């Protein structure tokens, strides 16, 4: 069982890539980094539980229904507070970048207290726990620390995506708050920019090749926080519509680099969440069909990056795909990227 803790938000987007100034209506979806991971993980074949706080209202009900609709256990969601967090997304196009405006001040999770969750009960039977750096940015970090301490006591694997958001807090505060938390983390997901800005970790002098730079960062981060594995993600933006992505896994003193994906983007929100869900899937006990051998680090990072790539083709925050579909993408890129119709 995977347990995810974080905020579920309402997403409002102008249709057809209109700008905010042109919008006469908004498309409504629900998501959030941790919820996206839980939903994607369940579709791959795992079991997940979502922990958050939502208001007792029609909008809160809609958010719960959205996540529960994917098969995620929502029994640990606390219902209190006055409002749901919102974010407005203006999708970019060509040379116009996407824009995000958050409206999450005083949302339900911002008022969470230690009394809201019985972590011993919530984490009973859990194998994995996932959070991102967004959660301590928008809520009391002590509540998250309580969960991490129970995970340590119970031997539950902890996964963290740093997922820094400059509109939520400064790099100085983020680094100070997250540093003690990362000592509880088994697998850390981060990119080069955030490793530098939050934790002061940079590649060794004179290292220029992208994979060598990421390998240097992985080694240093593992030593700094004691993580078992470090995953570093990379992206090259050609335009708002076209990106190239890859990832690197540092574990057991060895580096595994994923295939590179050239993407034409439908919706890039949630790509990193899909990667995290796929990584957890590769190390979980739910892979009865052995789609990914847990001892094969190269195949693990290839599977995770394939999930990231596939999410960019799916509208909304959540990757909607089974593990077999992710595997098909993983194999297709090794076959020159040829995509065949499934009949």
Where are these regions (language model features)?
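Ribokinase/PfkB-type carbohydrate-kinase core domain
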Residues: 1-3, 68-69, 74, 92-255, ...
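Glycine-rich phosphate/adenosyl-contacting loop at the front of the ribokinase-like
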Residues: 1-73, 113-115, 257, 264-266, ...
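A short, structured active-site edge motif that brings together acidic residues
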Residues: 76-85
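Short, glycine/acidic-enriched loop or turn micro-motifs at the edges of active sites
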Residues: 10, 164, 194, 270, ...
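Short beta-strand scaffold segments in enzyme catalytic cores
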Residues: 39, 86-90, 247-249
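Acidic, glycine-rich active-site loops and adjacent beta-strand->loop/helix elements
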Residues: 53-59, 82, 92, 106, ...
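Conserved post-catalytic alpha-helical subdomain immediately downstream of the catalytic base
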Residues: 259-336, 340-343
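Short, conserved phosphate/pyrophosphate- and ester-handling motifs at nucleotide-, phospho-/glycolipid
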Residues: 41, 191, 272
């Amino acid at each position: 069982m995977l347990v995810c803790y974080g905020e579920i938000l309402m997403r409002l987007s102008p249709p057809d890539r209109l700008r905010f100034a042109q919008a006469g209506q908004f498309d409504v979806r629900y998501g959030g980094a941790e919820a996206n991971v839980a939903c994607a993980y369940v579709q791959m074949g795992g079991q997940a539980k979502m922990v958050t706080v939502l208001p007792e209202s029609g909008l809160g009900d809609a958010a719960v229904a959205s996540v529960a609709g994917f098969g995620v256990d929502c029994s640990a969601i606390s219902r209190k507070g006055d409002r749901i967090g919102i974010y407005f997304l203006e999708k970019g196009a060509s040379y116009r970048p996407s824009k995000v405006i958050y409206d999450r001040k005083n949302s339900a999770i911002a008022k969470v207290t230690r009394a809201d969750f019985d972590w011993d009960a919530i984490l009973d039977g859990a194998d994995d726990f996932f959070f991102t750096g967004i959660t301590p940015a928008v809520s009391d970090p002590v509540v998250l620390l309580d969960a991490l301490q129970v995970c340590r006591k119970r031997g539950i694997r902890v996964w963290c995506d740093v997922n820094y958001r400059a509109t939520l807090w400064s790099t100085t505060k983020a680094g100070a708050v997250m540093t003690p938390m990362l000592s509880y983390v088994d697998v850390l997901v981060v990119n080069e920019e955030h490793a530098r800005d939050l934790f002061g970790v940079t590649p060794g002098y004179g290292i220029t090749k992208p994979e060598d730079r990421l390998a240097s960062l992985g080694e240093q981060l593992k030593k700094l926080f004691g993580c078992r594995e470090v995953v570093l993600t990379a992206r090259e933006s050609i335009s708002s519509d076209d990106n190239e992505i890859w990832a690197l896994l540092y574990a057991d003193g060895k580096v595994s680099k994923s295939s590179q994906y050239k993407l034409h983007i439908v919706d890039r929100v949630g790509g990193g969440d899909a990667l995290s869900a796929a990584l957890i899937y590769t190390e979980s006990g739910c892979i009865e069909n052995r789609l990914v051998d847990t001892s094969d680090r190269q195949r693990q990072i290839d599977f995770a990056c394939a999930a990231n790539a596939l999410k960019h083709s799916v509208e909304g925050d959540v990757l909607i795909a089974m593990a077999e579909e992710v595997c098909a993408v993983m194999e297709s890129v090794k076959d020159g990227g040829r995509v065949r119709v499934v009949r």
